Amino acid sequence: MASYQNRPGGQATDEYGNPIQQQYDEYGNPMGGGGYGTGGGGGATGGQGYGTGGQGYGSGGQGYGTGGQGYGTGTGTEGFGTGGGARHHGQEQLHKESGGGLGGMLHRSGSGSSSSSEDDGQGGRRKKGITQKIKEKLPGHHDQSGQAQAMGGMGSGYDAGGYGGEHHEKKGMMDKIKEKLPGGGR
């Protein structure tokens, strides 16, 4: 009887003779023919990763992409090293590493924190946007919420001519950028 096992174009079978179908991940990418396995490190969606032998996850906050032999290190706020052939699916949400991966949890460096909500002026709270959080961390930021600033209000009458005691507003960063753009200084 002829063996059809390792012929090109033939159907791959598992150890029990059952046909193996091509498997795809949630993004439609083929998961490879290496089967399943932890590959020595923990995947980011659970206790085990899907071993592909040739693909792993790259670096970054979301961690999508491919690495050499499945080795990669997360460089976001919480990154995880993977073992050989481990594959990353989903966002990096684990806080512990299971197995013999390359690295553990990467700790945040730097100082300072920003609250995720602020007073809305009506006795309640509202969530801050990412741009507001970034602006708070920049040097020269002055919190203007809850403070009414009267700039350029009434003059003394003598300064109405324009010379002498003109009061200039401090320009914001966006105003400075707009001035440098062609046609933006109107």
From Swiss-Prot:
<feature type="compositionally biased region" description="Gly residues">
    <location>
        <begin position="30"/>
        <end position="85"/>
    </location>
</feature>
<feature type="compositionally biased region" description="Low complexity">
    <location>
        <begin position="105"/>
        <end position="116"/>
    </location>
</feature>
<feature type="compositionally biased region" description="Basic and acidic residues">
    <location>
        <begin position="165"/>
        <end position="186"/>
    </location>
</feature>
<dbReference type="GO" id="GO:0016151">
    <property type="term" value="F:nickel cation binding"/>
</dbReference>
<feature type="compositionally biased region" description="Basic and acidic residues">
    <location>
        <begin position="133"/>
        <end position="144"/>
    </location>
</feature>
<dbReference type="Pfam" id="PF00257">
    <property type="entry name" value="Dehydrin"/>
</dbReference>
<dbReference type="GO" id="GO:0005829">
    <property type="term" value="C:cytosol"/>
</dbReference>
<feature type="compositionally biased region" description="Gly residues">
    <location>
        <begin position="152"/>
        <end position="164"/>
    </location>
</feature>
<feature type="compositionally biased region" description="Basic and acidic residues">
    <location>
        <begin position="89"/>
        <end position="98"/>
    </location>
</feature>
<dbReference type="GO" id="GO:0046872">
    <property type="term" value="F:metal ion binding"/>
</dbReference>
<dbReference type="GO" id="GO:0005507">
    <property type="term" value="F:copper ion binding"/>
</dbReference>
<dbReference type="GO" id="GO:0009737">
    <property type="term" value="P:response to abscisic acid"/>
</dbReference>
<dbReference type="GO" id="GO:0009961">
    <property type="term" value="P:response to 1-aminocyclopropane-1-carboxylic acid"/>
</dbReference>
<comment type="similarity">
    <text>Belongs to the plant dehydrin family.</text>
</comment>
<dbReference type="GO" id="GO:0009414">
    <property type="term" value="P:response to water deprivation"/>
</dbReference>
<dbReference type="GO" id="GO:0009631">
    <property type="term" value="P:cold acclimation"/>
</dbReference>
<dbReference type="InterPro" id="IPR000167">
    <property type="entry name" value="Dehydrin"/>
</dbReference>
<keyword id="KW-0346">Stress response</keyword>
<protein>
    <recommendedName>
        <fullName>Dehydrin Rab18</fullName>
    </recommendedName>
</protein>
<feature type="region of interest" description="Disordered">
    <location>
        <begin position="1"/>
        <end position="186"/>
    </location>
</feature>
<dbReference type="InterPro" id="IPR030513">
    <property type="entry name" value="Dehydrin_CS"/>
</dbReference>
